[in-house]
Amino acid sequence: MKFVDSARIVVKAGDGGNGCVSFRREKYVPKGGPDGGDGGRGGHVYLRANSQLATLLDFRYKKNYEALRGVHGQGSKKAGKTGKDIVINVPCGTLVKNSVSGEVICDLVEDGEEFLLARGGDGGRGNPHFTTSTRQAPRYAEPGGKGEELKVDLELKLMADVGLVGFPNAGKSTLISVLSAARPKIADYPFTTLVPNLGIVQYGEYKSFVMADIPGIIEGAAEGKGLGIQFLRHIERTKVLAVLVSGDGEDPVGEYRLLLGEMERFDPALLQKPRIIVVTKMDVVDEAFSLPDFEDDVPLIPVSSITRSGLEELRNALWNTINPSIP
């Protein structure tokens, strides 16, 4: 299934039904008076977070959503039925913005969470509402109100506990494939990963956490270079960042600092998240290799996805950072 993390849709709530102009017409009641019913309310448009969805792909094919209008009022004071509401399901982690103003409308995170996106128009009042002491037979009823209509942008931000961050070919996809059941495409060339991958990492017999592998960052990503900010937003919701640098690179410390710089330019709040430095590809480094000094107060774990060395230490460190109060 193709991964799509942005879409634009137009929603239209139902118009209200018109009020009715009607008068009693019964035998032996020559002046029956007004009896027009009220119109029904138009249908609302709701958004609902659904944990069974993982992409916004469906919205690339269906872009317009419209609820039903309310039914018009009838004689004998019969009110029109309310128009049927519609519920649009979106993946958990979907941010909704007004396409015109850019204003954030809602952020749907929890499964089943709902938001009223467009309100249906009120039903018009029938002619009995307009009687006065001097006007006993009004020939006027109120039209139904217009339902709200707006254009919105949907942005999906993945819901994961751990975000893997690194330059292309840092070993992110290989690492997530050995720690979880995820099977991303792996090859020895840059930008093998073109979309984010999610994997569930088991911890012990009954515990687990979710890890996200996003496409490799390059210098200038915050300004849109490479795959740019298209995927950087997917690490905004993570609880901890695993910053990967390749042990066989020429300047691991320089790579690390560049990665931090790109994240800070995109969103300074990313650097406030707990992070763990993961030095990968330890199976191919020279025997004389010694781990460089990165940051004194940030955990540093050397690993090899090939020999599996360091993986349990990394798994434990990630779990303890995500859940400091759960053994």
UniProtKB/Swiss-Prot annotation:
Localization terms from the record: Cytoplasm
EC number of this enzyme: 3.6.5.-
Domain named Obg: residues: 1-159
InterPro entries, A to Z: G_OBG (IPR031167), GTP-bd (IPR006073), GTP-bd_Obg/CgtA (IPR014100), GTP1-OBG_CS (IPR006074), GTP1_OBG_dom (IPR006169), GTP1_OBG_dom_sf (IPR036726), OBG_GTPase (IPR045086), P-loop_NTPase (IPR027417)
UniProt-annotated stretches for the region Disordered: 120-145
Positions of the OBG-type G domain: 160-323
Keyword Transport belongs to the record: no
Binding-site residues for GTP, renumbered to this chain: 166-173, 191-195, 213-216, 280-283, 304-306
A cellular component annotation (GO) from this entry: cytoplasm
Keywords on record: Cytoplasm, GTP-binding, Hydrolase, Magnesium, Metal-binding, Nucleotide-binding
Xref: Pfam families: GTP1_OBG, MMR_HSR1
Cofactor: Mg(2+)
Residues involved in Mg(2+) binding: S173, T193
First-tier enzyme category under EC: hydrolase
One Gene Ontology MF term: GTP binding
Subunit structure of this chain's protein: Monomer.
Family membership noted in the UniProt record: Belongs to the TRAFAC class OBG-HflX-like GTPase superfamily. OBG GTPase family.
Functional summary from the UniProt entry: An essential GTPase which binds GTP, GDP and possibly (p)ppGpp with moderate affinity, with high nucleotide exchange rates and a fairly low GTP hydrolysis rate. Plays a role in control of the cell cycle, stress response, ribosome biogenesis and in those bacteria that undergo differentiation, in morphogenesis control.
Name this protein carries in UniProt: GTPase Obg
Organism for this UniProt entry: Prosthecochloris aestuarii (strain DSM 271 / SK 413)
